């Protein structure tokens, strides 16, 4: 009966442990939604899938769980000791046997310092996971917007190819009487421009495949899966205040938070090292039984002894070395945090400038350069059809508007990529902070 109860209890413990692991997984409704690869369209589709499927992020998550379990173990006492003794050769007078149970208690404050160290390390592991999650999100968004830019650029070039082919037809129509097998200068210029754009389009298509490969690697998807062209969301970029960004960064950046917890863990380790000079206390009970040979159990005598023991911390040189090493580690981590903060602030300053500058360039292309280039192209195209402009001028105007449109898409992608990096550095979304 007792064996059956133990088996049932074991099954229940296993089930509860599995439930606990399942509950411990990152919990986000958007993340947990399984998205079919051919349905990836928005950044939310990509980042949500990556956060639940990326192998590297899962590995760091398990490191966090391991550190959490170690923190729980650090609060426990050492295992009690059990000893049993009897005489190898029984005497003719008495038969003697004894049982000893001992529990060691670390010196006052040792367990607390050890537990604080483990808890701070677990918090640091949590922040490391959060930093890895934000880095993955930034990388996915960077590749997403690059993929979107390349898709738009390919479409723009295809539209320009159609326009150039129209110019070629116009050039042929304007000079129909030519020797067989010869081309007019206008058609030569037009076809040269077409060939150049076709080569440019092929290069962008290859680059698009490379970018899609990076996305599939981040999402842990097979290489043979085809990702659809991503869709841009309409957005109105707003200037980010650098002082606000710095405040958010110092409060929420997970890398800095993780290093802060590591500093606290190192200081707790110093406290623990300082207590190595103090002994640990052991309390035990010894039960001894004696009886004459042939006597029954009721005629035996039992003695109980309370035991007190102490460890002897004699090797003080090793304790001093341990303390110095703990102090050195704490100082090193403090300096590491200072260097990390300075580096992150410098990076944030540069990216914030690029982000705000891109907003100005977005307005310049959208409101001034592209509309004026389109107006100029219409005027030159009309003049060319009427014979009042040459093909070189027309091709130049067409190339100018294509370059403006490509630059506009480039600056849109740069703006979104810079925002993704700023959000990673700040440790939070910045659209809600505007």
Per-range role (PLM):
Residues 7, 129-251, 351-354, 358, ...:
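Periplasmic alpha-helical coiled-coil/stalk elements that build and connect Gram-negative outer-membrane
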Residues 22-81, 85-86, 105, 119, ...:
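Bacterial Sec-pathway N-terminal export signals of envelope proteins
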Residues 2-7, 23-29, 35, 407-434:
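Acidic, low-complexity, intrinsically disordered peripheral segments
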Residues 47, 59-74, 132, 136-157, ...:
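Amphipathic alpha-helical coiled-coil segments
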Residues 58, 77-95, 105-131, 151, ...:
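Small/polar (Gly/Ser/Thr/Ala-rich) solvent-exposed segments
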Residues 99-103, 215, 308-312:
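Residues on the lipid-exposed face of transmembrane beta-strands in outer-membrane beta-barrel proteins
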Residues 9-18:
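Bacterial N-terminal signal peptides
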């Amino acid at each position: 009966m007792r064996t059956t109860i133990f088996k049932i209890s074991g099954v229940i413990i296993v089930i509860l442990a599995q439930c606990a692991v399942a509950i411990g997984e990152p919990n986000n409704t958007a993340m947990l939604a399984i998205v079919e690869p051919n349905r990836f369209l928005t950044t939310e589709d990509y980042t949500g899938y990556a956060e639940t499927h990326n192998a590297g992020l899962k590995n760091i998550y398990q490191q966090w769980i391991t550190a959490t379990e170690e923190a729980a173990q650090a609060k426990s006492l050492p295992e009690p000791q059990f000893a049993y003794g009897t005489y190898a050769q029984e005497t003719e007078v008495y038969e003697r046997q004894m049982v000893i149970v001992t529990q060691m208690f670390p010196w006052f404050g040792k367990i607390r310092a050890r537990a604080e160290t483990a808890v701070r390390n677990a918090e640091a592991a949590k922040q490391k996971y959060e930093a890895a999650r934000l880095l993955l999100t930034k990388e996915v968004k960077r590749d997403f917007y690059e993929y979107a830019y390349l898709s738009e650029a390919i479409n723009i070039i295809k539209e320009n190819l159609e326009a150039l082919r129209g110019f070629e037809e116009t050039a042929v129509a304007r000079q129909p009487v030519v020797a067989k097998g010869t081309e007019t200068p206008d058609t030569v210029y037009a076809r040269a421009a077409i060939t150049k754009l076709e080569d440019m389009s092929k290069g962008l298509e290859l680059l698009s495949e490379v970018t899609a490969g990076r996305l599939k690697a981040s999402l842990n998807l097979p290489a043979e899966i085809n990702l659809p062209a991503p869709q841009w969301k309409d957005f109105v970029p707003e200037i980010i205040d650098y002082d606000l960004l710095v405040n958010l960064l110092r409060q929420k950046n997970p890398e800095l938070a993780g290093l802060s917890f590591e500093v606290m863990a190192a200081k707790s380790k110093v406290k623990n090292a300082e207590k190595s000079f103090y002994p640990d206390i052991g309390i035990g009970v010894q039960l001894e039984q004696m009886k004459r040979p042939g006597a029954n159990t009721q005629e035996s005598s039992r003695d109980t002894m309370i035991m007190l023991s102490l460890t002897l911390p004699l090797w003080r040189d090793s304790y001093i070395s341990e303390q110095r090493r703990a102090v050195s580690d704490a100082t090193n981590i403090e300096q590491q945090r200072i260097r990390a903060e300075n580096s992150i602030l410098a990076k944030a300053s540069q990216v914030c400038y690029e982000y705000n500058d891109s907003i100005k360039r977005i307005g310049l292309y959208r409101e001034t350069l592209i509309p004026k280039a389109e107006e100029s192209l219409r005027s030159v195209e009309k003049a060319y059809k009427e014979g009042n402009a040459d093909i070189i001028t027309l091709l130049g105007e067409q190339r100018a508007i294509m370059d403006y449109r490509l630059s506009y898409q480039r600056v849109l992608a740069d703006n979104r990529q810079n925002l993704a990096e700023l959000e990673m550095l700040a440790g939070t979304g910045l659209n809600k902070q505007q």
